[in-house]
């Protein structure tokens, strides 16, 4: 069995980054991946402006007198255009263009307005005080977004602020999804003896949609090798990646491995993790392939740990980060046999001492999916580790946005 780290390294080294691109209006580019470095065409701000409501002043005037007349007003979008006489200030609002010659802006709370309309300043401001300088946020020619960045509710408004109307992106990844097994029934149909609902395909589709993939649903395939091969050949014609659920363990009716050897190549099909040992990765003639285990928890764990980064690579999402890991104290004993990296469902929180404390949630069988609902992390127990006693330190992996 291949350790998870080696499996992930092998997979990411083999998977290509996209080369095709398309150009979209920014209002249609949410959750897409930026396909080029984006350079600012302007300075932001494009002019010196006031950071406060107050008075624009020249320090030379204040050095002669701390009381000045008011020459006029400047508003955002309506700059002061009058004559700025000596020994006067300009009333200015936040965002308004700084009048030519101003050295500082004094906030209105530090100014006394006199009965005759003049204003008295309580202290001499510093040079440049409360002035936002041209290019202070973004300079003309700055790279504001790197290739491989996710376009979202933070990055797209930045492009809008620069007047950038369109952006080059990578195409959405096309992913074919299918389940295998005579025992599977679509959700909504009554169950007969020995049947179960096909939750894995539903789960995978939800995860793919959250990753902004274009999902091609090939449904449920019976345990029939000829139909399975036909579906594989059709799926690879339409998709960049084919994902199956079930059919990768060592069973008489598990055809995935055999078909993959026939129409493509298997790179690995067993990894040293629990749950999720029977995970397959390979290459069809025209598409890549990931085979998830049939047990629901195993399918979700392997998707999270392996398929998620694979999709990031194929999508061009080079800024994707692996899930964060933290140290925590376990509040209960944990059962663990050495030999495989173990991902147990857990719930973590801060205890009264301000420490991160974690406990397992529910039974940890690979077929027991309900424990995920009350979990917010994986408890990651090292491959060589055995049973864990309450009070010991363990590694946890808080769920990222994919599972929240």
Cite the ranges covered by each PLM segment:
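Short, low-complexity N-terminal leaders and the immediately following helix N-cap/first helix
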Residues: 1-64, 68, 312, 317-345
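Flexible glycine/proline-rich
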Residues: 22-27, 77, 138, 261-404
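Short, glycine/charged-enriched hinge/interface segments at domain edges or termini
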Residues: 2, 15, 23, 55-217, ...
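Solvent-exposed alpha-helices and their adjacent loops that cap or buttress functional pockets
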Residues: 48-50, 61-63, 81-85, 98-100, ...
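Helix-rich terminal scaffold detector
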Residues: 4-5, 165-292, 296-302
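Short, hydrophobic/aliphatic alpha-helical segments
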Residues: 30-43, 79-91, 281-282
